[in-house]
Amino acid sequence: MEYQIKAKRSVYVGKVFKVEQVDVTLPDGKPAIYDLVVHPGSVTIIPVDDQGLMYFVRQYRIGAGRMLLEMPAGTMEENEDPLECAKREVREETGMSGELIEVGDLFLAPGYTSEHMNLYLATGLYPAKLDGDEDEFLKVVTIPVKEVYKMIEMRQVNDGKTLAALMLALPFLKKYMD
């Protein structure tokens, strides 16, 4: 027997996501109720210029209660193509654009959210500023690629999506590590 979803109830609808309670029959036949954060999906972008500088953003994150160093990222609009979202987000958050290639995808925390994230490497960067969200206060920070991986070893980068993105992009970034 497999997990069987029996019913879903919306218990909260917010600006970005909603919360559902999901009635499930477990593989052993017993019932269970799960809380699920239903999310439209998101993207993370790893922007790297021709000199091997990575573009990060530093911003306050309410869940962490402090400023974090992160790759540019954003939430997709309903039915938005992930690549189009990535193109928009990198411009809004860093003021740069370039050629984007997908380096992977992942589920952020599948134990409680449906959020699926697509990860893109942006190269051949050029200025292309777009106005960002009114509630975002970001500082763009550039760091050489090889320094970024030293920072990871020293536990100075602790945003999960950023760490995953940097791991998936590593094969594309080795040329900047010499």
Model-found features: residue ranges?
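Acidic, metal-coordinating catalytic segment for phosphate/diphosphate chemistry
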Residues: 2, 8-44, 50
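Short, solvent-exposed loop/turn elements at beta->coil junctions and helix N-caps
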Residues: 8-11, 104-109
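Active-site-adjacent beta-strand/loop module that shapes the phosphate/pyrophosphate-binding cleft
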Residues: 20-26, 110-129, 141
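The catalytic Nudix box helix
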Residues: 56, 71-102, 120, 134-135, ...
